[in-house]
Amino acid sequence: MLRSRATINCVKSGRAGRALSRGMATFEGQPAARPNRLSKLLVRVGLATVGFYVGGVTLSLNNDQFGELFCDNVPLAESLVEMYEEFRDEKMQASRMSLDELKQKFGELGTKVDRIPNRGADPALTSQAVAALPASKEVRLEDESLVKLRLPEVEQLGSCKRATPLVESVNAAVAAVNEQSLLLPEDTYNAVHDAFTKLKSALQAINEDIRTNVAESVAVQYGQASKDLHESFEIRAKSREVELTQQFLNEFNAFKAQLEKHSSEELASALKANEQALLAKQSNEVALLSMKQVEEFTKILSEKLDQERQGRLSKLEALNGSVQELAEAVDQVDTLVMKSEVLSQLSLLTTLLKNKLHAGDESSVKIDSELARLKTLCDILPGRPSKCCSKNPQLLDVVVSQLDSLASQQLILSNEQLYNRWTLLQKDLSTSSLLPPNAGILGHISAKIFGFFLFNKNGAPVDNDIDSVIARVGQNLRLSKLDKAVEEVVALKGWPRVLCDEWVQEARKKLEIETLIDALDCEIRSS
């Protein structure tokens, strides 16, 4: 046992040495630490290594898969596991029960079996016999209390990147152990937990040492770098100052030369401009003097001409006034004659239009030529204010424009045509008077049949039935009273009014044209 413990200590020392060498290799490039910190670091690394091996051996004994992984990948792991198993076997052999104790424990079982006959056992006798036997001593084996091993993960050690791989490897081992869900005795669990706690403390101490060393190294390097940077900055500033001074002097000299050149050019251009201005002023004064002389000469000449005119041509002014008065009188007479002629032509034209509209021809009337002549005469009529100077349009212009819009390129029905169309409508109107309200097809057929038996009225009856209205309209058309005829037709209602709609439009158009011609005639006669 002493040999095994010595071997374990040697293995631990070897692992500590290798861990120290690995740690020193990992943290390559760090500044050299002081002796006391190095010894602390070695102690902590040794404790962490011991805790790692103790936890690995414990888990290997309880989990075969982890044991194979631990023995295959970790140096000296297999020998440590074998040493611990030998130590455990020796302890178990020392605690085994002797032969006498086994006989005392299990001997009474044979006595009970021998007492039972082969033919079977009577329940009553067996119970009495068993009750008479002395009670056997109960031997209890105390079960060891098992605890589930659950190790927490090691947290990342701040912002130290060099300790991160070590922490990640420890966390990977912890995760593998936690996945096995091992059940350990309480003392073993406490030992593993204490070792893991020491491992975490050692990792934290390593992290603190690394941070301290890094901070000191950074401070030293920062001071040296600041000093070097300050010196280089002063050197560059001096060289830059010399360069800027030389550049400024060069630019100043160039600007000075350019300014002198520009000033010389401006002075020369100013002198030239002043010279030209003086020459122009002199020429202007000479021209002004010559103009004054010409004006004086013209004035003298006009005075001489006025004197000559007053002497010999004094009567020409009176003759000129008489000629102007005669010209004005001739213009007035010409205007009156022209106006009279235009008015007479307009009067004749209106009479022609009236006769054309009231003619008894059976053909339609077209007055486009008369309208063109009417517009020409209205345009040349003297004495009318111009359209651009008058705010309100003249009656003559309004009448002519309305006539042009109504009759231009249009055919106007004569009185004979209106009468003939009305005669054609009489039969339909008489038939429509027989239609009931909202008549259908049967109503129209019945009205058409009974219409053949109707008698037409003649003359000017005073009744208000449809036959009397038809008779009065025909009488008014024969007497050329178109306005009264249209008034009678417009008063109709219902289907008769719908039948006469086209006739009413043509009659109204003719009445409007006749009214406009009458208004034009009145305006011409009043002019």
UniProtKB/Swiss-Prot annotation:
Top-rank lineage group of the source organism: Eukaryota
Segments in the Mitochondrial intermembrane topological domain: 62-527
Listed Pfam families: Mitofilin
Mitochondrial matrix side: 25-40
Keywords on record: Coiled coil, Membrane, Mitochondrion, Mitochondrion inner membrane, Transit peptide, Transmembrane, Transmembrane helix
Coiled-coil intervals: 313-335
Membrane topology label: Single-pass membrane protein
Single Gene Ontology BP annotation: cristae formation
GO CC terms in record: MICOS complex
Range of the transit peptide: 1-24
Residue spans crossing the bilayer: 41-61
Subcellular localization, as worded in the UniProt entry: Mitochondrion inner membrane
PANTHER family assigned to the protein according to its UniProt record, in alphabetical order: MICOS COMPLEX SUBUNIT MIC60 (PTHR15415:SF7), MITOFILIN (PTHR15415)
Family: Belongs to the MICOS complex subunit Mic60 family.
Protein name: MICOS complex subunit MIC60
